[in-house]
């Protein structure tokens, strides 16, 4: 999954997920942000990644599995926790947030 970076915006009422592609020493946005629970972010991300046929199935599965972990954590306990705690729990994810 090192070719891609999962990015998360950690909010009080939503969590947003996006994917960037690693290009050289930087990154390039691959998807827009998808919000949970406002929308079905996981399903939207899945469709977006499936539409990019050059992304391997293994990379798609790894990204979606990590998205599942993030959404589950946010739903179960994370929304009541500061995003810095989530960032410590998932160090491979790029987090920003308001709390």
UniProtKB/Swiss-Prot annotation:
Pfam family, one: PSRP-3_Ycf65
Quaternary structure and interacting proteins, as annotated: Part of the 30S ribosomal subunit.
Xref: Gene3D superfamilies: 3.30.390.140
One GO CC annotation: ribonucleoprotein complex
Keyword entries, A-Z: Ribonucleoprotein, Ribosomal protein
The keyword Metal-binding is annotated on this UniProt entry: no
Domain of life where this protein originates: Bacteria
UniProt keyword annotation of Repressor present: no
UniProt protein name: Probable small ribosomal subunit protein cS23
Upper classification of the organism: Bacteria, Bacillati, Cyanobacteriota, Cyanophyceae, Oscillatoriophycideae
